A protein has these predicted regions:
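N-terminal active-site segment of His-dependent metallophosphoesterases
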Residues: 1-59, 77
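Glycine-rich phosphate-binding loop signature in dinucleotide/nucleotide-binding domains
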Residues: 27-31, 139-144
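Alpha/beta-hydrolase fold active-site loops
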Residues: 2, 107, 145-147
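Extended active-site neighborhood of metal-dependent phosphoesterases/phosphodiesterases
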Residues: 51-143
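Active-site neighborhood of phospho(di)ester-bond hydrolases with catalytic His/Asp-centered motifs
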Residues: 6-8, 35-40, 64-71, 113, ...
């Protein structure tokens, strides 16, 4: 059986140590095959917050990791960074792929980035993203759970 651990809205920068410890213990107990960090990894997309998030992931030691940014993972107040390099701090911690894919014999997880640097709320999907996901789902193996 495949085990997936999804963590959403961690908001590093406002994290509570007891919650972090509980998550680490849960991960140790469950030994997930995949950890998904699904947006709002940080509170304000600051470099220090991404460093803390990366340190947390390093402590988890996941077998596999899939991350996608949330609206809190692009700068809100640093307008220059938001306009010209909105994902730079995210990419430094988690790589440049904003829409990663995880695939195994019985699992397909498609990461979809709904953030837009020009707006800080109400994520959206483009027609190209919808088509890309639909196409990939059509090509999934019958044995794969699709997420």
């Amino acid at each position: 059986m495949t085990t997936l651990l999804q963590i959403s809205d961690a908001h590093f920068g406002t994290e509570q140590p007891p919650v972090v410890q509980a998550l680490l213990q849960l991960a140790r107990d469950q030994a997930p095959d995949l950890v998904v960090m699904s947006g709002d990894i940080t509170q304000r997309a600051r470099r220090s917050q991404f460093k803390a998030a990366r340190a947390f992931i390093d402590r988890l030691k996941p077998a596999a990791l899939l991350t996608i940014p949330g609206n809190h993972d692009i700068p809100l107040f640093n307008l220059a960074l938001r306009a010209f390099a909105p994902y730079s701090n995210y990419s430094r911690a988690f790589g440049k792929n904003l829409e990663p894919l995880f695939e195994s014999a019985n699992l397909l997880v498609i990461g979809v980035n709904t953030t837009r640097p020009y707006k800080h709320v109400d994520g959206e999907l483009s027609p190209q993203q919808i088509e890309r996901v639909a196409d990939r789902l059509r090509r999934a193996a019958p044995s794969q759970l699709r997420i």
